[in-house]
Amino acid sequence: DIRLVMNDTKLTPNSGPAGGSRSQVMSGNACRLAAENLLAAMRKADGTYRNYEEMKSEGIETKVKGNWVATYCADHPVDQATSQGEPFSVYMYTLFLPEVAVDTMTGKVKVEKFTVVTDVGTIMNKLVVDGNFYGGLAQGIGLALSEDFEDLSKHTSLLRCGIPYILDVPDDLELHYIETYRPEGPYGAAGCGEAPLDAPHPAILNAIYNATGARITRIPAKPEVVLEALKAL
């Protein structure tokens, strides 16, 4: 049996937060190395593998304790004054193409379709990646058009804060994957958490501009905000 220990710094080193879309790269590489160490111990000279009893009888360790390992220090220069540069070794790249309908009489915006083209490296688990993007698109629609947490005296629940309803999310969501191998990711994978959360909302604002010529510079782009921008044209 394999028992996975998580979030216990008594047994596993603290590797930092799950930020910067680093979880798959960090945890994935750690899991890969652990599995490779285990397989190396199990492998026989003829290419077959020992079972647990055989390993015990031959005095082969059945438990491998990991250690802090640094094979090299990568050169990723960053300008501390401007934060420009390459602070990470693995990145994701995504194009968001929303199609919106704008009611110029009321200012109401409806996202009718969302097409996504993304390169997140080797896809390890497509259902998980799909879930990241579908969830991120729904959040992006809410962030762009309805979610407002500024007035907490008024918005006393998630519902009243403008979380999108299921009818606000289009059925027509297209995800297209390009798999470019990342040498420093586990089996060529990159992260996939930040792209679907960071970029859908500005893409929606750009779609409103493309449809109407009205440039929205603040979110959420509620009907009154869109109507104000339309009247200013």
Q: What role is predicted for each listed range?
A:
Residues N7-L137, L143, D148-D168, V225-L233:
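Cofactor-centric catalytic regions
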Residues R3-V5, L167-A189:
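Generic long, charged, amphipathic alpha-helical segments
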Residues L4, F114-V116, L175, A221:
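Hydrophobic/anchoring residues in structured secondary elements
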Residues P186-L205:
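C-terminal structured "cap/appendage" subdomains that terminate the fold
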